[in-house]
């Protein structure tokens, strides 16, 4: 029969092999900050260049900078809205 010392050694060996073979699960709170930083800088660069292209293309025009359409009737002289329009057109 096996002595208690041999059984103890076999149990210790089995426990050490069982703990060594257990797959290590990745820690869900460990983040790759380098990749996150590079991705953020890339997106920021693309949006910056897109903004510059939109500004330089002159297709984005402000509504109040456009001339009044010729088909619209002139508004009355005494209304509040017409006085605001007259004041805004004097700045040009």
Curated annotation (Swiss-Prot):
Residues 83-92 have a biased composition (Basic residues). Major plasma membrane substrate for cAMP-dependent protein kinase (PKA) and protein kinase C (PKC) in several different tissues. Phosphorylated in response to insulin and adrenergic stimulation. Phosphorylation at Ser-88 stimulates sodium/potassium-transporting ATPase activity while the unphosphorylated form inhibits sodium/potassium-transporting ATPase activity. Phosphorylation increases tetramerization, decreases binding to ATP1A1 and reduces inhibition of ATP1A1 activity. Phosphorylation at Ser-83 leads to greatly reduced interaction with ATP1A1, ATP1A2 and ATP1A3. It is found in: Cell membrane, Sarcolemma; Apical cell membrane; Membrane, Caveola; Cell membrane, Sarcolemma, T-tubule. The keyword Isomerase does not apply. Residues 1-20 form the signal peptide. The modification Phosphothreonine is found at residues 79, 89. Gene3D superfamilies: Single helix bin (1.20.5.780). It is a single-pass type I membrane protein. Belongs to the FXYD family. The cytoplasmic domain is sufficient to regulate sodium/potassium-transporting ATPase activity. This is Phospholemman. It comes from Rattus norvegicus (Rat). The lineage of its organism: Eukaryota, Metazoa, Chordata, Craniata, Vertebrata. The gene is Fxyd1.
């Amino acid at each position: 029969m096996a002595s208690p010392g041999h059984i103890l050694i076999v149990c210790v060996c089995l426990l050490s092999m069982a703990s060594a073979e257990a797959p290590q699960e990745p820690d869900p709170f460990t983040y790759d900050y380098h990749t996150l930083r590079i991705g953020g800088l890339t997106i920021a660069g693309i949006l910056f260049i897109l903004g510059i292209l939109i500004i330089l293309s002159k297709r984005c025009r402000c509504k109040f900078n456009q001339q009044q359409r010729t088909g619209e009737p002139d508004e009355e002289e005494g209304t509040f809205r017409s006085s605001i329009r007259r004041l805004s057109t004097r700045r040009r």
